[in-house]
Amino acid sequence: MSSGRIVQIIGAVLDVEFNRNEVPKIFDALLVDGTETTLEVQQQLGDGIVRTIAMGSTEGLKRNLPVTNTGGPISVPVGIGTLGRIMDVLGRPIDEEGPVQADERWSIHREAPSYAEQSNSTELLETGIKVIDLLCPFAKGGKVGLFGGAGVGKTVNMMELINNIALKHEGLSVFAGVGERTREGNDFYHEMQEAGVVNTEDFSKSKVAMVYGQMNEPPGNRLRVALSGLTMAEYFRDTKDPATGKGRDVLLFVDNIYRYTLAGTEVSALLGRMPSAVGYQPTLAEEMGMLQERITSTQSGSITSVQAVYVPADDLTDPSPATTFAHLDATVVLSRDIASQGIYPAVDPLDSTSRQLDPLVIGEEHYNVARGVQEVLQRYKELKDIIAILGMDELSEEDKLVVYRARKIQRFLSQPFHVAEVFTGAPGKYVPLRDTIASFKAIIAGEYDSLPEQAFYMAGGIDEVVAKAEKMKSSAA
């Protein structure tokens, strides 16, 4: 292993000088002697000098400190030993539960599976959330993006998906917290403990591994923590489960993929690269592709990923969310307008899309009901201007009926969440897909035209709506 010395420190960027014959390779991990600081080589400047990004604080470092080349990229522990643990970008435990008991370590920089190794799946993944299951269904082994501005419910939606999928799904999950609030990471850990997904008595019985690089971390950590989490998920996908002899089906949750882009922007600026549109790094598409192409399903197992995507200033054409769109199978767009009406989850039923919304995949009935719901909502959207100017009285009887049904559909797309019970006091509801399809089919057919629209708000199944309407009727009488 070659050794060098620090010659320059500018924030998180350090230049290290090595003997010209022993210059480290790009992405090699370097260790600063006498500290716990790890550096990752980003550029070779010539004359034996490499430019690196620190994976941690550079406080206390100074010029001429000796640095050792590890001879390989950053590696993280993988396998059953990671379950139930919270780790940082380097795989070090941060939950104060002792060292991670792992037999293997894998490099975080890996090749994406080849075209021949990949496999496609059309199997649906039921989430129990009506609006998602009906209008933007998820595929097992697919990639899903939750798009939304600040405060419209990305993290709450993701927590509910974890609650509904990960708790019912018998497989394993990996949660990568990329540049989000430490409080949210802490809440998530305690919720997982209460749900029994993290078993602190016997970690091997846990179902989730957690990797955190939070908001207060240096940009190097936030840039690489998604790769650390992905590497752990890849291990579960690619290695055989002793029970089945096949790779596993893994769930990968990333909150928030925008912070990954943002960390790349910071690192790019620190390295002196010329910025591109809106100040983003010129390598934005490449960096996003390197991450997303690895999140895929192979012949041995699958990775189903759910990624929260912050949308700056609610602008979906911003380069960061726009680049992310291209990689996803389903996009769930959260709308501030819908949130302002008090309808949660605030999913935009006309903006959200899924590759699975195809009659050959989901069946004719589901497809026709989903399109019928969207047609009613689209017509209501077109009529809103007329209603605002002339009022409801100027509409034809047919259009009035569309408006009444659309308002009921809008309210019925809301749903109480399990993870929000502590705030709302309303018990969470899981609605099976077949019930969702039957309920909306009946609403657009006019079977519930007689019920008041308030009865549809924050209900689970249609039976609950009927019961609410009866209660309202009896209390009014």
Swiss-Prot record:
List the record's Gene Ontology CC terms alphabetically: plasma membrane; proton-transporting ATP synthase complex
Query: What is the recorded membrane topology of this protein?
Result: Peripheral membrane protein
Q: What is its EC number?
A: 7.1.2.2
Q: Which UniProt keywords apply?
A: ATP synthesis, ATP-binding, Cell inner membrane, Cell membrane, CF(1), Hydrogen ion transport, Ion transport, Membrane, Nucleotide-binding, Translocase, Transport
Gene3D superfamilies found in the cross-reference section: 2.40.10.170, Bovine Mitochondrial F1-atpase, Atp Synthase Beta Chain, Chain D, domain 3, P-loop containing nucleotide triphosphate hydrolases
Where in this chain does the entry annotate a coiled-coil region?
A: none
Q: Which domain of life is it from?
A: Bacteria
| Subunit text | F-type ATPases have 2 components, CF(1) - the catalytic core - and CF(0) - the membrane proton channel. CF(1) has five subunits: alpha(3), beta(3), gamma(1), delta(1), epsilon(1). CF(0) has three main subunits: a(1), b(2) and c(9-12). The alpha and beta chains form an alternating ring which encloses part of the gamma chain. CF(1) is attached to CF(0) by a central stalk formed by the gamma and epsilon chains, while a peripheral stalk is formed by the delta and b chains.
What function does this protein fulfil?
Produces ATP from ADP in the presence of a proton gradient across the membrane. The catalytic sites are hosted primarily by the beta subunits.
* Family assignment from sequence similarity: Belongs to the ATPase alpha/beta chains family.
Protein name, per record: ATP synthase subunit beta
Q: Which organism is it from?
A: Psychrobacter cryohalolentis (strain ATCC BAA-1226 / DSM 17306 / VKM B-2378 / K5)
